[in-house]
Amino acid sequence: YGFALLLGKLGFSRIRSLARGLGSLLWTCLPKRRRLATESIARHLELSQATAESLARASFTHNARSFLESVLVPEFGLSHPLLDVERPDLLERLKRGERPSVITTAHLGAWELLASLLGDVSDHPRLTVVRTYKNKLMDYVTTRLRSSHGADVIGHREAAFPVLRALRKNGYAAFLADHNTSRSEAFFLPFLGEEAAVNKGPAVLAVRAKALVWPIALIRDGDRYRIIIEE
């Protein structure tokens, strides 16, 4: 954990550079993943091989950057100078906590950094629901980083009762809704010509707690970050 904190002190610009290097390394060292990504993009988006390969390579850099941005969670937050808020009025409503709030996002943009924003939203109970890592050290480090702004991190298998308790205190619960999941836990919706599983857990808990649902994404905008909030 201490090494992760030191790595975060490198700052946003150096982490971007590291991500480019790591993405290139992964692209070179993982030929099966490289082919799978390129073929999937070409098939689902109906693109040429060259365009699909370019997008696939960019996705490797994106994933590397998302992974490394986890060490920046302690450095980020709602008052960070690199953050732009698209709808300040909705952010203020969210912060007031007049109703329990279920926040949904996806593996889109700088999703790891959203943990810092949730921690800064309010003093009400705040939970981030995640899938735990099988590697205990990795799980420990990422949990410490994600909770560094005060939000509690909880595994999705044990989440239902803690989430309901938090929501009944006008708290906040954040979910990544695009994880693949079992048929009993999912809605299936059309996506790029196939059926994709969407976890129905956040919707069920929101209904039970009479909570507002807030779709939120943190998008990279050049060297800056832009938070998009819907209600």
Where do the protein language model's features map onto the residues?
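Membrane-anchoring hydrophobic helices of lipid-metabolizing enzymes
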Residues: 1-105, 110, 122, 139-144, ...
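Short amphipathic alpha-helical segments and helix-helix/interface helices
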Residues: 91-92, 115-119, 142-143, 163-164, ...
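Anion (oxyanion) recognition and catalysis
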Residues: 95, 119, 147, 167, ...
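Membrane-associated lipid acylation/remodeling enzymes share a hydrophobic transmembrane-juxtamembrane segment
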Residues: 158-221
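Short, electropositive alpha-helical surface patch
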Residues: 226-231
